[in-house]
Design a protein with these regions (language model features):
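An extended acidic
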Residues: 7-15, 55, 60-130, 223-280, ...
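Non-catalytic C-terminal accessory modules of carbohydrate-active enzymes
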Residues: 71-130, 134-135, 674, 687-889
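Extended, loop-rich substrate-binding clefts of extracytoplasmic carbohydrate-active enzymes
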Residues: 100-149, 274-299, 368-372
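Polysaccharide-binding surfaces and accessory modules of carbohydrate-active proteins
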Residues: 143-146, 150-280, 331-349, 723
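Catalytic cores of carbohydrate-active enzymes
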Residues: 169-171, 441-442, 559-667, 705, ...
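Acidic/polar, glycine-enriched structural segments that form the non-catalytic walls/loops
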Residues: 177-178, 196, 207, 212, ...
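Active-site acid/base region of carbohydrate-active enzymes
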Residues: 358-376, 383, 418-421, 430-439, ...
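Aromatic-rich carbohydrate-recognition surfaces in CAZymes
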Residues: 401-408, 412-523, 554-557, 561, ...
Length: 889
């Protein structure tokens, strides 16, 4: 038996598909294999279900190992267009049935077939089913780009010596399922999360369905709330918790007429259910009468195959955004449908961040996969009229909340180097939520509704200032700062406009003047910073308001030191020198205040009030330590002490990244080693990798690897999540469930005491209820490559301090390239505007002496050494990057 690729885990293996892209061949029989089962709330999802993401810039297909696909679409409100509710004969869609009169082949996985192969690919789910000398190869893929549809490509093969008359029946449901946060809050308040889905389905049941034929090729479905067709005519958008509008959906054959259809999914499946539907036994009724919850879109094509012959059918399933017509959506697909999967797959290779390292092929595979998973999670919000990269995971798919504002800003960091358009859209999205005084709200629910929680994190403005500053410094896109955008609530009499720059300054003023500093000169904490549990899970409830007023955050302070230095660079580029001085002065005051909180071993974590005092004096909290290093707030003689403590107390015992705390804290409501009480967080470890890259190259590289999917799969091969996607936090070695993510023990024990713990939790959901498609474990490994090559953008250009401890590697992206070989270094810089740029290489003294040749834009130049640096200048032009090489001979 051949050895699996590194990082494959138990449930299948990594392969390279026919397009040269990574894919995961899933081989687990989840129905009969106990290793497939994880503890979760089975009223929400099956404990045997494993999920893969197939998406583009407009929608997300959540693909199940059972073979069905649910389509997430966010216009109106985030929702599934096609619910999976077996009790009501609703099975989502994306599968079908091949019938030869006697036998049946299904692309829904039942565990009973002769052969059923599944491949989770970049942009697709592939299912290859064989039996009765017939085979079906079905690929459900999301075409690359911004089109609101999936393609079902079905290749049918007759492997017999006789001709066959066959029927292919394609199924897609159309009962929607809104991710209503209102339903979540109601169920949580009643201490029964099973009510959440019940209430969401009750809301969906208030919509009637109306079907029409699309010529002889398919079906178009419209929904109306309680039969009122005038609901869709409202002109001025208003923020809502739940939307009474839903887009039209369609199912269309792209290469041939349909020869039967049904709109009644309930009767189609009948008593036989999904494995042996009643409807396959005879002809489909071909009527449009169904208007209630029984609705579905089912179409049939008939195929005559000669012996050994194959034929491919194509179907499009999708929705129509407001103002978009079906012909517009389908025009290109009807013309060149045979090449669409190839084109889409090839497109995923473009405009991405890449890293290849000699003798470590798994690194390049993982990087390509992260690029895909990050971008394919994108959806479109029609209230803010921008694309969004929400955190996904349990937050979006279970609770129905787009939180927190800092998260989409982290997710776009890698796109600075490959897709500026996406970066600007997310920045605009966040700016459009900003309140009149410059406060950024915690998050958004429903359609444009600011989340109604008494929670006011004090760090959110920092993330906006940082990401925007990094974007401007990298791309030199100063024009973006003058772009005019609408301000919240965007529509009606209260609507207004401002520029990006004015909004940034407004947010800066909120951070420095309204949030401001406390008695120790540190940034105030409010109800929390990055860590929601710093106050809510740590401070007695009766003290919350006092801590909100007086508390101070060392995490916010250390982060602000760095962020404000970058914001000052941005202001300097646009020659706003008066404000530059103000920002630098404020940052310097924070640096002085932080240094006063060094306890001889590490920096403290936070100050609450005079009664509760400091936290983080006896226990090492990871969060503020990396930012202190990044912001140069650590004295040189403190650095070895701090790094040694991080390594010894947080890193050494973990195979999958540093944990948040050196030991658990009893007063926290969460189990030790879980979530904020000492769990492992990729978003925090991303800052740790960055900090380590400044002081310890070997440790930085080691920490980067520990936080990869491959290392999680090697350390915990029997945990399915963490192989191709994962959650935002894993349990650390302080937990008895190391390597898993959070779940309530009640779902193992059934003990009433454990149920009580669950009911007292501030969220009430298992992270295992939807343990994948969080974007932090995909975004941070990509962004951290910049730190491994030591790239830093400055006012004048780009600076490199390469630390990756490898003889040969190659980093590339549309904006920036950097390559190391035995002969030397080379690279390019391609900002969005023309200019002359300063390039600085910081190298070891012994290495510096070996270089004797410099090429700039293919012309020989003299090498200029300034202390331990090579410094030169070069010009980039439109479509012509600044290219350079330094060589040893």
């Amino acid at each position: 038996m051949s050895k699996k690729s590194f990082g494959s885990g138990y449930f299948g293996e990594w392969i390279e598909d026919e397009f040269g892209l990574p894919a995961y061949r899933y081989t687990c029989d989840q129905i009969n294999d106990p290793k497939a089962i994880i503890p979760l709330n089975e009223k929400l999802r099956s404990n045997k279900e494993h999920l893969h993401q197939i998406g583009n810039d407009r929608l997300v297909g959540v693909a199940s190992n059972f073979g069905y696909v649910q389509v997430r679409q966010d216009e109106g409100c985030p929702k599934f267009l096609n619910d999976y509710d077996p009790e009501q004969n609703q099975f989502a869609g994306g599968f079908g049935y091949l019938v030869d009169g006697e036998n049946l082949l299904s692309t829904f996985y039942s565990g009973n077939g002769d052969s059923f192969n599944r491949i989770f690919g970049i942009g697709y789910l592939r299912k290859i089913v064989k039996g009765h000398d017939l085979s079906v190869d079905q690929v459900i893929f999301a075409p690359y780009g911004d089109d609101p549809l999936l393609i079902s490509q079905v290749t049918i093969s007759n492997n017999t010596e006789q001709s066959k008359n066959l029927r292919w029946i394609e199924y897609w449901g159309c009962k929607m399922f809104q991710f209503s946060a209102l339903a979540y809050y109601t169920a949580f308040g009643q201490k029964d999360l099973s009510l959440m889905n019940k209430k969401r389905r009750e809301f969906s049941s208030k919509f009637s369905h109306e079907f029409s034929l699309i010529g002889n090729s398919g079906l178009l479905e419209a929904k109306y709330f309680q039969g009122r067709k005038d609901e869709n005519k409202r002109e001025i958008p208003k923020p809502v918790y739940e939307s009474k509008k839903s887009p039209k959906t369609f199912l269309v054959s792209l290469n041939g007429p349909i020869e039967g259809f049904s709109t009644n999914g309930f009767d189609f499946f009948g008593k036989g259910g999904v494995e042996l539907p009643d409807g396959v036994k005879g002809t489909l009724p071909s009527n449009l009468d169904t208007v209630d919850d029984k609705s579905a879109m089912i179409v049939e094509q008939r195929v005559h195959l000669k012996p050994k012959e194959s034929r491919t059918l194509y179907f499009a399933y999708g929705y129509l955004p407001k103002g978009v017509y079906l012909d517009q959506v389908l025009k290109d697909y009807k013309k060149e449908i045979d090449n669409q999967w190839d084109y889409s797959s090839e497109s995923w290779k473009r405009n991405i961040v890449k890293l290849s390292i000699s003798k470590e092929a798994w690194v390049e595979r993982e990087i390509i996969w992260h690029n895909y998973y990050l971008r394919s999670a994108m959806t479109y919000d029609d209230y803010f009229n921008e694309h969004i990269l929400s955190q996904g995971h349990v937050y979006q798919y279970i609770m129905g909340v787009q939180i927190a504002a800092r998260d989409p800003l982290q997710h776009i960091l890698p796109f600075i180097f490959c897709e500026p358009k996406i970066v600007k859209e997310i920045i605009r999205y966040i700016l459009k939520t900003v309140k009149e005084d410059g406060e950024i709200p915690y998050g958004v629910i429903g359609n444009g509704k600011i989340i109604p929680l008494p929670f006011f994190p004090s760090d959110l403005e920092l993330w906006l200032l940082w990401v925007t500053s990094e974007y401007i410094l990298a791309t030199r896109d100063k024009e973006f700062l003058e772009e005019v955008i609408p301000t919240y609530p965007l529509y009606g009499k209260e609507a207004n406009t401002s520029t990006v720059l004015k909004m940034l300054i407004l947010c800066y003023n909120h951070f420095t003047e309204i949030t401001g500093t406390g008695k120790h000169g540190l940034q105030r904490l409010s109800t929390g910073d990055w860590n929601d549990g710093a106050v809510m899970g740590h401070v007695p409830e009766e003290k919350h308001e006092e801590v909100r007023i007086h508390g101070e955050s060392i995490l916010n302070t250390t982060m602000a030191i760095y962020v404000l230095s970058k914001f000052a660079d941005l202001l300097s580029i646009i020659e706003n020198y008066d404000m530059v001085d103000e920002v630098i002065k404020y940052a310097e005051s924070l640096k002085k205040a932080v240094k006063a909180q060094w306890n001889g071993q590490w920096f403290k974590r936070a100050w609450f009030n005079d009664d509760l005092g400091w936290i983080g004096d006896e226990i090492l909290w990871l969060e503020p330590q990396p930012w202190a290093i990044i912001g140069d707030a650590v004295d040189n003689d403190w650095i070895p002490i701090l790094i040694n403590n991080i390594d010894k107390l947080l890193r050494n015992s973990s195979k999958i990244g540093a944990r948040l705390l050196s030991k658990g804290i009893d007063v926290m409501k969460k189990e030790v080693g879980v979530r904020a009480n000492g769990g492992i967080w990729p978003s925090i470890n991303g800052t740790l990798i960055w900090a380590l890259s400044c002081v310890n190259s070997e440790m930085a590289w080691d920490e980067w690897k520990k936080n990869t999917l491959a290392f999680h799969a090697e350390a915990f091969p029997d945990i399915w999540y963490g192989i191709w996607s994962g959650p935002d936090t894993y349990n650390s070695d302080l937990s008895i469930y190391h390597g898993q993510t959070h779940f309530f023990e009640y779902f193992i024990t059934g003990d009433p005491k454990d149920k009580k713990i669950m009911l007292e939790d501030p969220f009430g959901v298992n992270w295992t209820d939807f343990p994948v498609m969080n974007l932090h474990p995909h975004a941070w490994p990509l962004y951290n490559i910049i730190h491994l090559i030591g790239a830093k953008f400055t006012e004048e250009g780009i600076e490199f301090s390469p630390i990756l401890p490898k003889e040969k590697y190659n980093f590339s992206s549309p904006i920036l390239g950097f390559k190391k070989t035995k002969e030397g270094y080379s690279g390019w810089y391609a900002p969005l505007v023309e200019g002359n740029w300063k390039v600085t290489l910081n190298l070891d003294k012994d290495e510096l002496k070996q270089f004797i040749r410099l090429e700039i834009n293919e012309k020989e130049n003299e090498i200029s050494f300034i202390e331990d640096q090579i410094v030169f200048y070069g010009r980039s032009e439109q479509n012509k990057p600044l290219r350079w090489k330094i060589k040893k001979s």
